[in-house]
Amino acid sequence: MSLDLALDVQYATASDYLPSEDQFALWVKTAIGNSMEQAELTIRIVDARESQMLNSTYRGKDKPTNVLSFPFEAPPEIELPLLGDLVICAAVVENEAREQDKTLEAHWAHMVVHGCLHLLGYDHIEDEEAEEMESLETQLIESLGFTDPYKEQ
């Protein structure tokens, strides 16, 4: 089964390196796998100011963050392939990649996979859930040719 993906990438900030729409599509398809036959998803790339505003509004944390996931929840009687939205802060991803000694491409891929797993219902609040999510992230990231994102450098 191949995923029929409708992906809208919104570049709301500039940066030295931003992944292409094709890269985003590959990472999303890898993360979603066979979970759905069709999916519609928006990825919005933002600056630190917009990330901080959204993080403050929706999570009560007054600072920019790497990725925010906004799952779409349709009423029970309506079936739509809308997965939701990811908002990724380019500046935070770049800083984290540098601090963690990772390539920008690898860290972008990790943030997309991580965000998509949240949209699919995975979480990392409880230790057991975190282990399951991190294990799946690692498998998916390694399948893309990158190293374990949680391995200490």
UniProtKB/Swiss-Prot annotation:
Annotated transmembrane regions: none
Domain of life: Bacteria
EC number: 3.1.-.-
Cofactor: Zn(2+)
Any matching Pfam family: YbeY
Entry note: cofactor: Binds 1 zinc ion.
Enzyme class per UniProt: hydrolase
GO biological process: rRNA processing
Keywords: Cytoplasm, Endonuclease, Hydrolase, Metal-binding, Nuclease, Ribosome biogenesis, rRNA processing, Zinc
Entry binding sites for Zn(2+): 114, 118, 124
Keyword presence, Oxidoreductase: no
GO CC entries: cytoplasm
Molecular-function annotations in GO: metalloendopeptidase activity; RNA endonuclease activity; zinc ion binding
Function description: Single strand-specific metallo-endoribonuclease involved in late-stage 70S ribosome quality control and in maturation of the 3' terminus of the 16S rRNA.
Protein family: Belongs to the endoribonuclease YbeY family.
Name of protein: Endoribonuclease YbeY
Protein's organism: Shewanella sp. (strain ANA-3)
Originating gene: ybeY
